[in-house]
Each structure stands twice: as C-alpha cells, then as structure tokens.
C-alpha cells in the first residue's frame, strides 16, 4: 500500500495599526486516501505597551492516521478516519524587566474522530486503533524565565489540562494525560560549555481504577552537559532520573493484575563524543 500526503502552507503578518498585528494563514493537505482538507488559521495581537502584548488565535487542523495505525497486523484498522478539529488560544506576554520574561495562555480544543488504542481482548492483551467520539479539552499554560547572569538562566513552567470523558474513556484519556505538569530548570551557556538541569513534575494523574499507576504524583530530575572541544567535536554527558524515582507512564492494571506497569527508566547515564564531518 502506498500513501502520499502533500501539504502547502502560507501565512502573512500584517501590522494594520501602530499597536495591532493580524496573521492569517491557510494550510492545504492532500492525502491519497483521505482527500483534500483546508485548515485556516488567524491570530490577532495587541501591544498594550513596550512590555506587554496580548493575543488571540484560532486554527483548524487535519491529522491523517499513520501507516502503523492503519495497517499493522495486530493493532491496525483500515477503517480509521482522520482527526479534524479546531483550537482557540488567548494569552499574554509580559516582560517584568530586562531579565524577566513571562507568558500566560488559555486554550480550548475540540477534536472530532480522535484516534486511540482500545483493548479488544484482555486475555490475549490485544487491541486495535479506533476513532473515538469528539474529544474536548481545555487548559492553562504559564511560564517565566529569568536571566540570572550573562551565562546562567532559570525557567519555570506550569500546565493544567482537562480532557472531557467520553463514553469509552474517562477524563484525561484514562489518566494518561496528567491534570497538572510542572517543568523547571537551569541553563548555563558560554563559548565552550553548556549545561542543563531539568526538573519535571507530574501531579494528580487520574486513572480508570485505584492503583492504575504506582504513583499519581512524581518528580524527575535530569542533568546534562556539553563541551565543545573544537568547532566540529563535542563531548557530552547526561544523567537521567538522578534520584532513581520509580514511576510508570503505561499500565495494564485495568485488564491484568495489580502492579502490571511498564515502569519508566531508573537512573541511567550517557557519555559520548559527537563529531560533525
């Protein structure tokens, strides 16, 4: 089976008044199996002052099933429909000073024929990709970044997500999408070195039943560094899950036995050399 998908996109930013900017756009997808789909978008921005900008944006989208979702011998479903939907965003960018930047936004999204995997035979642990009912979601994104020194910066972000339950799935896609997520970090950059501390917090991950996941709330920390020996030679190192936190992002407890999780990786290390030719 041969599938082709050609996409074309054009947008134009138009400053139609001293403080106002509008950016219309359009994307056209032509899929060999699902035809032609047109997805418009538009955003409107207003500069309140030199430090603050507010904006509103609307976009539509089309997402065809992947070849794996369609044709895999165990999970595939040739009757899948493409996902279509729209999203609305409303937000504000604000600079508290020369070294402080912040963003706050609200989003609302509606997806028709959302594609997801469904267990069809718990005894054999086999399933199939299917289209769900319309999926509606809304949430908040907030982040702030501070330049501490010439080379060192800090960042903090928070996301709240709520995905409505459907007749076949509970809220937040059976708990696989957390309600609250926190991201924080430190970044160091200079001519030779860059180093990063990344912290991720998953808070209140709901599930279809008790103990679907070993922890509903957990925190992970990673650290990495790169040293540029020459323009085309870099030595790198990384420690993932520094505190060896036990967690799982996939689970079969609903269909199997207590503790049937796919745990995430424990503490692990990477060290290497990258040469660009």
Predicted region positions:
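Transmembrane beta-barrel strands of outer-membrane/channel proteins
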Residues: 24-28, 56-60, 69, 104-108, ...
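Residues on the lipid-exposed face of transmembrane beta-strands in outer-membrane beta-barrel proteins
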Residues: 10-12, 42-46, 90-94, 142-146, ...
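Surface-exposed extracellular loop regions of Gram-negative outer-membrane beta-barrel proteins
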Residues: 1-31, 39-41, 59, 151-158
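Repeated loop/turn-to-beta-strand initiation elements of outer-membrane beta-barrel proteins
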Residues: 19-22, 51-54, 98-102, 151-154, ...
């Amino acid at each position: 089976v041969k599938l082709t998908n050609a996409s074309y996109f054009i947008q134009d930013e138009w400053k139609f008044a001293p403080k106002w900017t509008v950016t219309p756009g359009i994307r056209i997808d032509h899929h060999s199996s699902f035809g032609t789909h047109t997805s418009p978008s538009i955003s409107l921005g207003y500069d309140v002052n030199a430090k603050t900008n507010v904006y509103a944006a609307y976009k539509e989208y089309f997402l065809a099933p992947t070849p794996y979702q369609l044709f895999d011998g165990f999970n595939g479903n040739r009757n899948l429909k493409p996902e279509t939907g729209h999203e609305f965003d409303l937000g504000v960018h604000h600079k508290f000073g020369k070294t402080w930047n912040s963003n706050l936004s609200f989003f609302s999204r509606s997806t028709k024929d959302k594609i997801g995997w469904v267990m069809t035979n718990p005894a054999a642990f086999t399933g199939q990709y299917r289209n769900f009912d319309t999926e509606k979601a809304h949430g908040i994104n907030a982040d702030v970044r501070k330049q501490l020194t010439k080379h060192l910066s800090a960042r903090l972000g928070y996301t709240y997500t709520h995905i409505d339950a459907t007749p076949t799935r509970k809220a937040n896609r059976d708990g696989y999408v957390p309600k609250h997520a926190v991201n924080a970090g430190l970044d160091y950059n200079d001519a030779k070195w860059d180093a990063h501390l990344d912290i991720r917090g998953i808070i209140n991950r709901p599930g279809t039943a008790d103990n679907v996941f070993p922890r509903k709330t957990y925190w992970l920390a990673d650290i990495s560094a790169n040293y540029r020996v020459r323009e085309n030679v870099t030595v790198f190192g990384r420690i993932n899950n520094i505190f060896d936190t036990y967690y799982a992002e996939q689970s079969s407890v609903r269909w199997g036995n207590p503790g049937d999780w796919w745990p995430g990786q424990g503490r692990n290390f990477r060290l290497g050399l990258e040469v660009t030719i």
